[in-house]
Every structure is written in C-alpha cells, then in structure tokens.
C-alpha cells in the first residue's frame, strides 16, 4: 500500500501560503517553510496593528483639537467639558476634521463653548 502524503490538499495549502508571500524577498517567497513563518508573522502584525491604528488615530485627533483650541485660549479638557455642558455632540474625529480644514468654523464653535467653561 503506497504512503499517503496529502497530495492535492497539501499542494493547495502550500500554494495558498506561497501566494500570500508574494512580494517578499528571497527564500521568504520561495521556500514553503520560511514563507509560512513569514506569512504567520505578517498576519500577527496586521492583527495587532489594526487595533493600534484605532488608538493612534484617536490620539492624533486629540492632538489636533488641542492645538486648535489653544489658539483660542482654552485647553482640550476645558473645551470637551464645555461641549458636553453646551449639549454639542460632535465626536473627536469630526472636531479634528473641522479644526484641520476650517479653523474659522472651529473658532465659532469655541466661542459657543466659552460661556460654559469655568474660569480657571
């Protein structure tokens, strides 16, 4: 009885891994074992970084809002607190976009918030 080695299924899986390793350098795209490790590591990085991307973008939005608000004499904390008290519900992404693209509109928003901010 001949030895069963997987045949079609193994070949299909190997081809799948090697196609995922396209664009890699040298043995990382040619040798199955090396390519499998490289692809596994790449998938780990992409999984991790999809989550980090969300944190990084939120941090960027907060930085942009803070920089824009300071031009109008407030801090980020005061501004966010004032927004809540003024019942203005804009998320940080939208606020950062307004601050980045249209500083005049953002200035009007800050002026609406200022009466609700406690004098420090």
UniProtKB/Swiss-Prot annotation:
Keyword Ribonucleoprotein in annotation: yes
InterPro entries named in the record: Ribosomal_bL20, RIBOSOMAL_L20_CS, Ribosomal_protein_bL20_C
GO cellular component terms attached to this protein's record: cytosolic large ribosomal subunit
Keyword flag Ribosomal protein: yes
Pfam families, sorted: Ribosomal_L20
A molecular function (GO) term: rRNA binding
One biological process term in Gene Ontology: ribosomal large subunit assembly
Alphabetically ordered keywords of this record: Ribonucleoprotein, Ribosomal protein, RNA-binding, rRNA-binding
PANTHER family: 39S RIBOSOMAL PROTEIN L20
Record-stated family: Belongs to the bacterial ribosomal protein bL20 family.
Function: Binds directly to 23S ribosomal RNA and is necessary for the in vitro assembly process of the 50S ribosomal subunit. It is not involved in the protein synthesizing functions of that subunit.
Protein's name according to its UniProt entry: Large ribosomal subunit protein bL20
Gene of this entry: rplT
């Amino acid at each position: 009885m001949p030895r069963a080695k997987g045949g079609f299924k193994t070949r299909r899986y190997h081809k799948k891994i090697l196609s995922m390793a396209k664009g890699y350098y040298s043995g990382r795209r040619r040798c199955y074992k090396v390519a499998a490790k490289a692809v596994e590591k790449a998938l780990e990085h992409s999984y991790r970084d999809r989550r980090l991307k969300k944190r990084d973008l939120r941090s960027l939005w907060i930085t942009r809002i803070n920089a824009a608000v300071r031009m109008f004499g407030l801090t980020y904390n005061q501004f966010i607190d004032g927004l809540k008290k003024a019942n203005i519900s804009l998320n940080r992404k939208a606020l950062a976009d307004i601050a980045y693209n249209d500083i005049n509109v953002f200035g009007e928003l800050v002026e609406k918030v200022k009466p609700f901010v406690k004098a420090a």
